[in-house]
Amino acid sequence: MHLVLSLLLLLSAEPAQSKLPIELREGLAIRGVTRGGRVPFPLDAVQYAIVAGTFAKPEGGAEIEFGEAKRIWERLVAEEDGSIRGSAFSGGYAYFEVERPQREIAILEATGHGMAYVNGEPLAGDPYGYGYSKLPVDLKEGPNALLFASGRGNFRAKLTPPPASAFFNLSDATLPDLLEGDSAPNWAGVILVNATRSPLTGLVVRTQVEGGKAADTETPSARTPLDLQGGDSNRSLRYDRRFDGRPQAHADPLRSNARLPEAQLRVRGPRQTRKVTFLSQIDGSVQYYALNPATDDAPGKALILSTHGASVEAIGQADAYSPKPWANLVAPTNRRPYGFDWEDWGRKDALEVLEHASQKLQADRSRTYVTGHSMGGHGAWYLGLTFPDLFSAMAPSAGWVSFFSYAGGQRIEPSTGIADLFSRAANPSDTLGLVRNSSKQNVYILHGDKDDNVPVREARSMNVGAGSDRQDVPISRAARSGPLVGW
């Protein structure tokens, strides 16, 4: 089933665009001017200069002091396909300059970077290279400075003309799966890009499900429901968008003949895994979790919360399980395939999903379990030990213990009152320090003896810690290597 979205708006005409796109292929790079990790204050010589107001246009051969070392800006050239190896500016920055004959709006499409500065304006990055970052930038007449912090893997960037003054970016949409025979409303989140220099007004979003009639909705508020009429059955899809409009003078109607964006919506049967969208009470955004439903709809079943590993989508996590006759399985997103290791906002997302799903499925809260693999195994430890009242059992698989044991986090030795504050602020991440909370829980630990991704010592340390108060913690070991052992 297709969902078609179109945007009708009133806005003043934009000046003609100059020749775009422009691929960023030649610039300067500097390596080794940052030191991050799980520390309260990462070191960054370039960012320090930006904040201090001393950063200037770099020149080839120019030096930056970083501790006792001196780093040099070096010439940077992209490969034939336009990509730049991440190692070319690992732990550093890449700088490009783009000359424009006039002021204009462009869309920055970049991947593999931690963040960007365009003429000093900070912009979010796409560190894992998903390719969904399409950000409008206001280029000035003359030279424009583009500075990119290093991310993961290869980097590429280009400036493209906006397809319209306002357009949808569907590459990062949060869309539901529709359930056969279900007329309940759903939520969807779609990014609307404003490629102008002013707030827009008079916006109307038109939605149409394949085979149904179109519905127009004005968007004067931050959140707007949109009605969609399906083909054989009536369904409604609520579209969440954030936009504050202000009146504009001298507005002219604008209509685009470009192809309307279409979003693919899956229609799933009652026993199939599916995406369930909801409106988050944390920040008002649309989020989803994946549901692997039990083999029948009887209420009062157990609920399994499954936390995914790094780079795994929640729907893929749910698909990895066979359906259970006795339990529904729910996989939250962590707000992204990487998120923050199920801590902080990842923790909040998991707890919100647990509550939403428990109510919706009428779960037996005395039979709520948490499991997860790799990063999700850490999530199972972290959630299960931090909230032992919510889970009657936990089953971490190939899970690491904490930032201090696995992810390179540094413990701050209290020496002053301020240092002590930061040390205590890190206590929620000290999973091993919470292990006694498992004294009333059932715990099953699964780990590979030769796991070359998460060392088996992580499981053994938790087994010893849990065993200090109890002697019935089972640990299953597989004498194989690789992060997916025992999955």
Predicted regions span which residues?
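Mobile cap/lid helix-loop segments that gate and shape the active-site cleft of serine hydrolases
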Residues: 309, 392-435, 440
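Accessory carbohydrate-binding/adhesion or oligomerization-edge regions at the termini
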Residues: 14-84, 97, 149-177, 289-291
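A domain-start/cap signature at the N-terminus of enzymes
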Residues: 175-178, 212-298
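Gly/Ser-rich "nucleophile elbow"/oxyanion-hole loop immediately N-terminal to the catalytic nucleophile
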Residues: 295-299, 343-375, 385-391, 437
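Short beta-strand element of the alpha/beta-hydrolase
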Residues: 299-310
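Aromatic-lined ligand-binding clefts that engage carbohydrates, nucleic acids, or primary amines
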Residues: 100-117, 146-148
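C-terminal catalytic histidine-bearing segment of alpha/beta-hydrolase fold enzymes
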Residues: 450-452, 456-487
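Short beta-strand/loop motif that positions the catalytic acidic residue
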Residues: 438, 444-447, 451
